């Protein structure tokens, strides 16, 4: 992060911590911040005006550190990684207004890393890879805040803003620095009368990331990079080549950005809640006249929830559905240099990729006074098609699924023991075709097959896992927590290991 941005984030942190400290002068309660969030479905919606549907105020602050290790990992993940961070969050309800806010910082360091050069691999429909294992450092700052205000009997307004800034650095050739910024704002309103409440909100978002690569050390030959244009088909060449766009004259690195504009509608009747959110997205790779790719798309999210309260326990049922569709257009650009001045001439674009992503996640929770239990499942379908060179067309259908169950028990009012188990699996199918038999001799598109096979094995391998955590409340809201997780994959041929382990320690204060 640039020094100016870091100074601003430190100021925001001081302001937020002071706010939470002032708000925290209340009596302690058995219910934690996460449990208060769960009570009100509006807390997880895109309309912050609904947070006043509940009246409990809770806050917490936590310092944590963790370690991950093992060879059962995605192609871009670290074999070993450390992390440390701090987070504070609060919900506060006053007479006519409520506030919700959070701040977090995380320092993460991974070893033996290569592959995707982005901070969130897979988010964008195009990717860029490098192949020299080395250490990466990632810093992430996140700040969000919102309010809900009673403007008149039965009417509420609110607004929420989320801000995340991240910077990543790899200090071994091929070196690269990343700067990422995510911003989301959602103003909204709500009408409520008796057991009925309805609301609507506008949602605007922007995400932007720039990858800047460089080679510092001396080598007999330059390092190679790969530009993935879809399904791991693309361009493999020296990183300074024009095909991977990491070192283009007139462009600062490889910039990617995406905007989203949409709306969300919410409705609640007694314990039943529903939300529909739609967004139109527009993304690009490049800047100024050098726009190499554009990727417009659509996104729909549906969130359903039901809460039933009994005499001694509460039942929560949730169902989340997501759909995302994107198309990728590659621009046909020509550079024309005259009298030392270079201009870029555009000759249209070709659609080289389409992808559609579906997700479904049902969850049930049983919450009693001294123990809880849950069961959930997650299903994801990824359907993609790539056509970079006419007349070749490649299609893929990828499915991933997992089921998870677990519970938590409180002992003597100060100790919480939690455990869960998980089972996952997946499948992938592909088909290659030609849309025309008489298109003439054309060289088939290049695929980074070894890396593709490695990632598909990780995505589709059968796996089992388990997690265990212990939390101890030792003094007036202060607590310590230790957690561990283990994951094991079956029938592996390409991955370097069959196990992945995680450990975490935390100390915090809830008020």
What is the role of each PLM region?
Residues 71-77, 111-118, 168-176, 211-217, ...:
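Outer-membrane beta-barrel translocator domains and adjoining extracellular loop/strand segments
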Residues 78-84, 135-152, 160, 178, ...:
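Outer-membrane beta-barrel transmembrane strands
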Residues 236-372:
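Long, internal scaffold/assembly segments composed of regular secondary structure
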Residues 59-67, 101-107, 159-165, 200-206, ...:
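Transmembrane beta-barrel strands of outer-membrane/channel proteins
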Residues 93-97, 150-154, 192-194, 270-272, ...:
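Outer-membrane beta-barrel channels and translocator barrels
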Residues 26-111, 124:
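N-terminal, post-signal peptide beta-strand-biased segments of exported outer-membrane/organellar beta-barrel
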Residues 499-511:
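Outer-membrane beta-barrel "beta-signal"
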């Amino acid at each position: 992060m640039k020094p100016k941005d870091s100074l601003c984030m430190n100021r925001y942190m001081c302001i937020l911590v002071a706010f939470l400290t002032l708000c925290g002068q209340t009596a302690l309660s058995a219910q934690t911040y996460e449990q208060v969030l769960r009570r009100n479905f509006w807390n997880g919606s895109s309309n912050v005006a609904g947070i006043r549907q509940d009246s409990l105020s809770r806050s917490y602050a936590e310092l944590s550190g963790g370690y991950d290790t093992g060879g059962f990992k995605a192609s871009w993940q670290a074999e070993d990684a450390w992390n440390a961070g701090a987070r504070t969050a609060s919900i506060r309800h006053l007479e006519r207004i409520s506030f919700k806010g959070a701040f977090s910082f995380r320092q993460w360091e991974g070893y033996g890393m290569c592959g995707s050069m982005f901070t969130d691999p897979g988010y964008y429909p195009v990717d860029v890879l490098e192949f020299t294992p080395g250490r990466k450092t990632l810093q992430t700052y996140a700040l969000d805040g919102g309010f809900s205000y009673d403007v008149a009997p039965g009417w509420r307004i609110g607004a929420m803003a989320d801000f995340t800034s991240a910077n990543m650095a790899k200090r071994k050739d091929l070196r690269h620095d990343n700067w990422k910024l995510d911003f989301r704002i959602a103003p909204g309103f709500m009408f409520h009368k008796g057991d009925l409440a309805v609301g609507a909100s506008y949602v605007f978002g922007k995400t932007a990331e720039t990858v800047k690569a460089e080679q510092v050390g001396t080598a007999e030959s330059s390092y190679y990079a790969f530009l993935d244009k879809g399904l791991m088909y693309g361009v493999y060449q020296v990183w300074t080549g024009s095909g991977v766009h990491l070192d283009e004259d007139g462009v600062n690195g490889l910039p990617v950005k995406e905007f989203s504009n949409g709306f969300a509608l919410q409705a609640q009747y007694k314990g039943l809640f529903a939300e529909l959110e739609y967004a139109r997205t527009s993304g690009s790779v490049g800047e100024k006249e050098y726009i190499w790719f554009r990727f417009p798309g659509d996104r729909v999210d549906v969130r359903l929830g039901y809460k039933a309260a009994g005499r001694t326990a509460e039942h929560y049922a949730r169902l989340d559905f997501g759909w995302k569709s994107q198309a990728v257009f590659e621009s046909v650009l020509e550079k024309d240099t005259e009298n030392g001045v270079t201009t870029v001439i555009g000759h249209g674009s070709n659609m080289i990729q389409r992808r559609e992503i579906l997700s479904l996640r049902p969850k049930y929770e049983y919450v009693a006074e001294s123990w809880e239990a849950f069961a959930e499942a997650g299903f994801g379908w990824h359907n993609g098609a790539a056509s970079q060179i006419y007349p070749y067309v490649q299609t893929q259908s990828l499915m991933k699924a997992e089921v998870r169950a677990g519970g938590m028990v409180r002992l003597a009012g100060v100790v919480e023991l939690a455990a869960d188990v998980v089972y996952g699996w997946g499948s992938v199918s592909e088909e290659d075709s030609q849309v025309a038999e008489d298109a003439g001799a054309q060289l088939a598109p290049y695929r980074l097959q070894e890396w593709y096979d490695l990632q598909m094995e990780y995505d589709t391998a059968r796996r089992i896992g388990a997690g265990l955590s212990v939390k101890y409340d030792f003094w007036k809201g202060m607590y310590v927590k230790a957690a561990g997780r283990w994951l094991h994959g079956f029938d592996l041929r390409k991955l370097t290991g069959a196990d992945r382990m995680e450990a975490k320690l935390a100390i915090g204060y809830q008020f």
